[in-house]
């Protein structure tokens, strides 16, 4: 579990408890500029202890994701996409180590699968049964897939400019 230790106001320095699904507003000055403060030493210990033997996807890093008990959820399998060494772009950039992350191998072929997976897992933990998203395409498709797996009803709002194939994928 990696919930913030506390929230710190960037305006007045006030520290307050983190409360999931509650708007982060400073209780001292009313600022909306609060930064989550984490125990990074604990993250390091958990990462080093827990990675070997875990599945190769986003949930490999469950100890540092903002979830209480991800092991208890039927999780959307995001992440774990290949990283390719680029023979084409490395020379012009003057660096022999240029890699390209290939998200085509994810559930909806978008890097937005990762955010959707974590957000929907948090919704499950919070007891959310229905959600809304406004999107121009990829986010709606990723959230639609993750919410469908989780049994969360999703309302999707898109403009008429969104390509038909994205509308079909999100439906």
Tell me what each language-model feature is.
Residues 1-171:
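PLP-dependent amino-acid enzyme catalytic core
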């Amino acid at each position: 579990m990696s919930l913030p230790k506390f929230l710190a106001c960037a305006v007045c320095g006030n520290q307050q408890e983190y409360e999931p699904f509650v708007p982060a507003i400073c209780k001292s000055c009313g600022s909306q500029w609060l930064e989550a403060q984490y125990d990074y030493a604990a993250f390091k210990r958990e990462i080093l202890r827990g990675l070997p033997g875990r599945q190769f996807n986003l949930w490999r890093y469950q100890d540092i994701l903002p979830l209480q008990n991800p092991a208890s959820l039927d999780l959307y399998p995001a992440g774990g996409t290949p990283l390719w060494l680029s023979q084409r772009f490395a020379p012009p950039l003057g660096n022999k180590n240029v890699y390209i992350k290939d998200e085509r191998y994810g559930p909806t072929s978008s890097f937005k699968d990762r955010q959707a997976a974590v957000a929907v897992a948090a919704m499950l933990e919070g007891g959310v049964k229905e959600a809304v998203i406004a999107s121009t395409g990829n986010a709606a498709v990723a959230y639609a897939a993750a919410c469908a797996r989780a049994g969360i009803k999703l309302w999707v709002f898109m403009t008429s400019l969104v390509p038909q194939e994205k509308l079909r994928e999100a439906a």
